[in-house]
């Protein structure tokens, strides 16, 4: 498989006044969607760490993969997906989604069990040229030691992206591997800082058992 579609959704759930059972029900309902024919990989869970230059306070994350935009669209309108979305409306305070094409699919479509996912979303400054966008994505593709897989791409679904236009997701073996490359990633950020208006970084744990 040469390319895949990456689909990332960030949720802010109103967990202050909501029965935790409703949150668990939503998360479990989303994770059951992995059984749909269109889905190559899907995981939803709580955010371990959120780093952002704005006041965003998302609490949960969904990452899923598809063969094509058509499969993503079919997933979006599938009755099971529509039902889960409708059932969770009352506990969602905020939501955003970013989709991109990974031109080279990772060898393993499902990340290793027990690994740590790291999503980076960028909102670029106005009038950033196409050449600069390509440069940004090349910088973000740099694969440090400890990264099992990484994809980067330009968002093609602006409707719910809050103007974030570039996304990347990488999977590390554990938190220690992320901490080990912190300095390298800061240098990476310095290379693209002049083009970036806002950044959201999300880290989350992939369960150690399926």
UniProtKB/Swiss-Prot annotation:
Keyword Repeat listed: no
Induction: Induced by salicylic acid (SA), jasmonic acid (JA) and infection with the fungal pathogen F.oxysporum.
Any single GO BP term: response to jasmonic acid
SMART domains with a match to the protein in the record: Dabb
Keyword Metal-binding on entry: no
Residue stretches making up the Stress-response A/B barrel domain: 5-100, 116-204
Matching InterPro entries: Dabb, Dimeric_a/b-barrel, HS1/DABB1-like
Keywords for this protein: Cytoplasm, Plant defense
PROSITE patterns listed in its UniProt record: S_R_A_B_BARREL (PS51502)
Subunit record text: Homodimer.
The protein's name: Stress-response A/B barrel domain-containing protein DABB1
Organism: Arabidopsis thaliana (Mouse-ear cress)
Lineage: Eukaryota, Viridiplantae, Streptophyta, Embryophyta, Tracheophyta
């Amino acid at each position: 498989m040469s390319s895949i579609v990456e689909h990332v959704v960030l949720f802010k759930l109103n967990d202050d006044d909501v029965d935790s059972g409703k949150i668990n029900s939503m998360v479990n309902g989303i994770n059951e969607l992995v059984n749909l024919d269109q889905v190559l990989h899907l995981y939803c869970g709580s955010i371990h760490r959120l780093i952002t230059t704005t006041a965003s306070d998302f609490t949960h994350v969904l990452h899923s993969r598809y063969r094509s935009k058509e499969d993503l669209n079919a997933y979006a309108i599938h009755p099971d997906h529509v039902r889960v979305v409708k059932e969770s409306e009352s506990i969602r305070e905020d939501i955003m989604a970013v989709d991109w094409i990974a031109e080279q699919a990772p060898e393993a479509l499902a990340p290793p069990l027990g690994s740590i996912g790291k999503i980076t979303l960028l909102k670029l400054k106005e009038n950033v040229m196409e050449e600069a966008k390509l440069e940004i994505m090349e910088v973000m593709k740099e694969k440090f030691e400890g990264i099992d897989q990484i994809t980067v791409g330009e968002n093609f679904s602006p409707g719910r992206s809050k103007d974030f236009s570039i996304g990347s997701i990488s999977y590390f073996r554990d938190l220690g591997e992320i901490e080990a490359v912190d300095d390298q990633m800061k240098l990476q950020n310095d290379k693209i800082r002049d083009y970036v208006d806002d950044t959201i970084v999300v880290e989350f744990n992939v369960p150690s058992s399926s």
